[in-house]
Amino acid sequence: MVLVEPRNIIGRKISQIRKLKGITQEDLAARLNVQRINIDRPMISKIENQTREILDYEIKGMSVALCVPIEDFFK
């Protein structure tokens, strides 16, 4: 089995916060699209599974969509 190096450090935290707030990946994608951030459900899955990078403006959008300070992603 080949281990893949994580492509981001906050994906698991995004998943945890999203689930605690009862938000589906589909709902999160819709909230991001309202902000004109083009991320769909499969991309959110990849971010949460740490197989896709996340850009700075996407982190900001996730913060707004999940109603948490950006710092919470790094705790």
Question: What feature does the model see in each segment?
Answer:
Residues 51, 55-72:
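DNA major-groove recognition helix of helix-turn-helix/homeodomain DNA-binding modules
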Residues 12-33:
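Short basic helix-loop element that most often maps to the first helix and adjoining turn
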Residues 1-9, 74:
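A detector for short, charged/polar N-terminal pre-domain segments
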Residues 14, 25, 41, 56-59:
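Helix-turn-helix DNA-binding elements, focusing on the entry/boundary residues of the two helices
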Residues 14, 28-29, 44-47, 73:
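Conserved hydrophobic/aromatic packing and binding residues within compact polymer-binding modules
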Residues 33-53:
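Recognition helix of helix-turn-helix/homeodomain-like DNA-binding domains
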